[in-house]
Amino acid sequence: MDGAHDMGGVPWSDPVQPEPDEPMFHAEWERRAFAITLAMAMPGGWNIDMSRFAREDRPPEDYLQKSYYQIWLAGLERLLLQRGLVEPDEIAAAKSLHPAKPVARTLTRDGVAAMLHRGGPTERDAKHPALFMAGERVRARNIHPPTHTRLPQYVRGHVGIVERVLGCHVFPDSNASGNGENPQWLYTVKFEGHELWGNEGDPNLQVSVDAWEPYLERA
């Protein structure tokens, strides 16, 4: 979807100013919000793409006024409400008011290290050969889906060169909507700065983007 989360290359956004010696968390509640989001994915039954969409699917004014982990917390609340694991009055009261709903799976403290070590591999067996090869010119499709996508707006409609073929991976657009993994070939595509930003762009700039096959067409 197009939204405030996709800010790369927009002319009105200020440069990112990294915080010197930035800590991983600025407050204890941020640490807890991060941990709860990871832990609740198991009983909640959502995947990483659903979680991303829950965070980004909000009005720009709401998204931009929230801090990073406030967005995470808002996304978590939405997922919990959608699955009936909490009620709106519990969110408002910030405490449990009703009997807990039964869940099929939980993540215990003893299982955290193994889960993080295992990770979440996304590569899958391919059902057909890759459509593109390294060195081939491709154009990023000018798409504007209303749901989750990993194709940045600033490359849409522009031509690049396939740098690498990365294998067949879970397709985020389908996975985020609950329509299955629908694995698709994934490519690293290199775009020249002048192609993205015009003649005023840095002539030495190149941007590489990982793009799934449905995002691309032959140039």
Features from the language model and the residues they span:
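Short, basic/aromatic beta-hairpin or loop at an interaction surface
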Residues: 103-119
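Basic/polar N-terminal segments that are highly enriched at the extreme N-terminus
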Residues: 1, 104, 108, 217-219
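Basic/aromatic-rich interaction segments and small domains that mediate binding to polyanionic partners
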Residues: 12-37, 79, 119-134, 142-219
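N-terminal intrinsically disordered, low-complexity, charge/repeat-rich segments that act as generic
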Residues: 1-102
